Amino acid sequence: MEEIQRYLQLDRSQQHDFLYPLIFQEYIYGLAHDQGFNRWILLENPGYDNKSSLLIVKRLITQMYQQNHFLISANDSNQNPFLGRNKNLYPQIISEGFAFIVEIPFSLRLILSLEGKKKKIVKSHNLRSIHSIFPFLEDNFSHLNFVLDILIPHPIHLEILVQTLRYWVKDASSLHLLRFFLHEYCNWNSLITPKKASSSFSKRNQRLFFFLYNSHVCEYESIFVFLRNQSSHLRSTSSRALLERIYFYGKIERLVDVFVKDFQTNLCLFKDPFMHYVRYQGKSILASKGTPLLMNKWKYYLVTFWQCYFSLWFHPRRIYLNQLSNHSLEFVGYLSSVRLNASVVRSQILENSFLINNAIKKFDTLVPIIPLIGSLAKAKFCNVLGYPISKPVRADLSDSDIIDRFGRICRNLSHYHSGSSKKKSLYRIKYILRLSCARTLARKHKSTVRAFLKKLGSELLEEFLMSEEQVLSLTFPKASSTLRGVYRSRIWYLDIICINDLINQK
């Protein structure tokens, strides 16, 4: 971010007012693709070179306003051969650059708030990991009873996302350009259904899509800040946690006025001291220690409020009320539940002995084996029953490249599911990938699996078959002697910032 501040050379208090001129600055598009800024990007969007010409960018914006619909001339293709192979290069450059520009004021506000507090910055990077959610669930969900499983709907219209940015970005020219860009290039209704969004807009413009979508979701999530502050049993949340919001206190006052006007008689229903909210991508969880009646009231009041004030059209059937003790919650690639562990304690007083039965609630995380096998079958590693099959590969790939690809997939899945309470399902996934790799190699050499392994030996699969215990010993070499048996327990890593494609497939 120091490079951003040096490039911009603008007054900090006025950066969010003059974003439009930055669109015509060539270095912005270089920074947008700089590998050094990958830590600020959730998902990379490769597919074109990192050098963007200022002439190309200016020509694209001119064509947008002249209704030329992103025509690429022959001269452009001759100057840059890559343009002939990718007709979406122009819109991708603009979307990446615009996403980088609108993120600048929010990133700088975060840095300003944490200046001189480097320890907190380090902690904020750790909290970016998906696995950081599960320690929070372990500490809190074991004491809760019911959970609302919420599927967040997509905005009805992209115009809603643009209107949300008006609270954060005051530069009207930039917002007009964004609206025009979305109207000309993207399907305005592409976000109504997830399938259309994943196939058209979000895949090619992931960074811009996630920024617009998260900004809209953060708007309606502000209601939870108000409800938490209204609870007499909870401490108020510092506004530092919502630094990306402009006029935070003004919005809170507006929410107070809304509730006093429309929900005055029912405000006491939200006095729940054990309400917790977690969200990732298009799914959120609202858990409480309250009764089913209270949770149903939460459900209908929140749905009504979101529909009236945020144009977020929830269907009541998209919100499921379940009891944690007898229901497994599917969230970010895990099946989570709260189960009772019975333990018997023998107590003896003088000559009399007693057996005391204790039931302790424990947060349990399992690997969803059936959806994961379905993802492997979709990727042609096995059939729908989980039987490994050979995967067609290019003939010019060497055996080591094939083994490395299969091994990388296996290690990524093992790394992500290291927090599973039971490893048997994970071992089954490893077996499928291992045998699929062997069948693929045997198919390439036109031989059987047994003959291939007998001829070349099993040492070729050593890297592929590296156990989790060996990975831990490499990660913590000084403490390898004390890690025996640790691999059998749950381990949460703080370097996982995105879900593997095999885990995220539906």
UniProtKB/Swiss-Prot annotation:
Superkingdom, natural source: Eukaryota
GO MF term list: RNA binding
Signal peptide: none
InterPro entries named in the record: Domain_X (IPR024937), Maturase_MatK (IPR002866), Maturase_MatK_N (IPR024942)
Keywords: Chloroplast, mRNA processing, Plastid, RNA-binding, tRNA processing
GO biological process: mRNA processing; RNA splicing; tRNA processing
Subcellular location: Plastid, Chloroplast
GO cellular component: chloroplast
Similarity comment text for this entry: Belongs to the intron maturase 2 family. MatK subfamily.
Function: Usually encoded in the trnK tRNA gene intron. Probably assists in splicing its own and other chloroplast group II introns.
Protein name in the entry: Maturase K
Organism of provenance: Olea europaea
